[in-house]
Every structure is written in structure tokens, then in C-alpha cells.
């Protein structure tokens, strides 16, 4: 919905791609080949991820805690550096030259992110609001007339 609008809020998912890696165990070590585990986490494009064997989700968890600590200490430089490191995991996994490149890893991140944005849009619209824009990790919601 192009144009300039009043009363719009932006709902931004905090570190969406790192959150997906952490929550859904998207990790080269966790990528299941051969026998399928009963309780595997389903990814996309054939990706299945172990609930027990992984590295990146733990690294991201540690970085997340460190970033929250940096923010609590008003250390914006460190907080931003940690954010860049966390986001770089997705970038590295999506690089063909990376030793751990596998299209199932990146598609399990991007397609899960897309699914989350679409589900959020549907939820918001079911509540009677209009989503006027969405991107990789946020949606813009038109609130309509707001009484002063």
C-alpha cells in the first residue's frame, strides 16, 4: 500500500535469523543425513535437524547473553559488534565457498523467517489491523484512527 500514512507501528523481530538458528537448531552438525530421528526438527527443502547435536545454536545463545549484558552496561559498540557476529552466521552458511555450505541450511533459515512474517501478518489482520508492508524481519501495521 504505497503512500504516506499516519498511525503506523513497526513490529521488528529481534535478531530473527539468529533466533531461527537458535530455536530450530539450524546447524551443519545438526543436519541429519541417512536415518531420520523420531524427534528431529523439520527444516525446509529436505533439511532435518537434530535436537541433541549442534554447535551454532549454543554459540548464538552465548552471544545473545553477551549482547544483552553489553546493552545493560550501555556498551553500544560491543552490542553492535556482537549483533554483526550473530548475523554473520547466516551469511557464512549461505556462501558457496564455505566449508559448511548446504542449501538446506540457508533455506531453513530464510523460509522459516518468511513463514514467521506471513503468520504474523495473518494474525495481525485477524485482529482487524492492516499490514501495509513487510520485509525480512518486520511488519508495518496501520493502526487507523487513533483518538487523542
Give residue ranges: language-model regions.
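Conserved acidic
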Residues: 1-148
